[in-house]
Amino acid sequence: MDVHLRLAERRDAEAIRSIYNPEVVESTVTFDLVPRTIEDQVAWLDDHSGGHPAIVATDGADDVVGFGSLSPYRPRAAYSTTVEDSVYVHRDARGAGVGAALLGELVRLGTAHGFHSAIARIVGNHEASIALHSGCGFSTIGTEREIGRKFGRWLDVVLMQRML
C-alpha cells in the first residue's frame, strides 16, 4: 500500500471516527465505552495541534486508513516533557505498514517538538501493538494489573517507553 502521512484536519473527523468507534464497541484496545459523536471527534482534533498533533495516513486515493496522535502524558507540569502516543489503523489496512509509518512519524514529531520521552499504554492482550512499539524502539517498562474493566473482564495495561 502506498501510504502518505499528513497532519489531521477537521475534514478528517468522520474518517477518524469510522476507524475509532468500531474499536470502542467491539474491542478492548481503547478503554472508551461510548462511541464518539462527530462533535466529540472535532473537539478531539481541535485539542491535538501544535506540540501534540494528530496525523492521518492516507492511501493513494487519499482515503484515511489510519491515524495517530501525541497527547500530554499527565497534566502536572513536571510531566510536560513526556508524551503518550496513540495509533489506530483501519481493519482493512492492517499488516500493510500503516501503523509503523504512523508511529515512526509520531516519534519524529515528538523529537522535533523537543519532548524527552514517549509512553505507550497498551491493553495487555494487544500483541500487534506491543510488537509495533517494540519494532519502533520502545521497551516494556511495566504492567498495570487489572486497572480497566470492559466487556465484563479485567484488563491489564502494558507500559512501553522510548527516549526521544
Language model features by range: what are they?
Residues 4-16:
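A short beta-loop-alpha structural element at the N-terminal edge
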Residues 7, 33-92, 103-105, 109, ...:
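Acetyl-CoA-dependent GNAT
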Residues 18-35:
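Helix-loop element at the rim of GNAT/NAT acetyltransferase active sites that forms part
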Residues 20, 62, 133, 138, ...:
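Conserved active-site tyrosine of GNAT-family acetyltransferases
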Residues 52, 155-159:
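Short hydrophobic/aromatic beta-strand or adjacent loop that forms the aromatic wall/cage
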Residues 69-72, 77, 119-122, 134, ...:
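Conserved catalytic-core motifs of GNAT/GCN5-like acyltransferases
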Residues 95-110, 127, 131-135:
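Conserved acetyl-CoA-binding loop-helix of GNAT-fold acetyltransferases
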Residues 110-122:
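Conserved GNAT acetyl-CoA-binding A-motif
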